[in-house]
Amino acid sequence: MNRSYHVYALSDRIKAKRIEREIEKVDGVKKIRFSKDLKEMSIEMENSKITAVMERVVNICNRISYGCEVHYKFS
């Protein structure tokens, strides 16, 4: 399943790359990418692991970029 998220307070591309590398290692994640302006993140993941994946994603984002927040993007 592919889901999109709004990303707030991500300060630079270097931190975004670090976040991408760590999230790619999370069990259940197939693919991740940030938009060019770093305000949106798209994650392709297994349906059965959405909750566990997103708990890790939020922790990774906040640890690498202090104050970074991730919110589900409703279509």
How should these model regions be labeled?
Residues 1-10:
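Short glycine-/aliphatic-rich beta-strand segments at the starts of folded cytosolic domains
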Residues 13-17:
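Conserved redox-active cysteine motifs that mediate thiol-disulfide chemistry
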Residues 20-35, 67:
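Short acidic amphipathic segments
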Residues 8, 42-46:
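Short hydrophobic/aromatic beta-strand micro-patches
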Residues 18-23, 53-62:
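Short amphipathic alpha-helices in soluble, non-transmembrane regions
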Residues 33, 62-75:
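Conserved short beta-strand edge segments in small beta-sheet-based binding/regulatory domains
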Residues 12, 46-51:
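Helix N-cap motif at beta-to-alpha junctions
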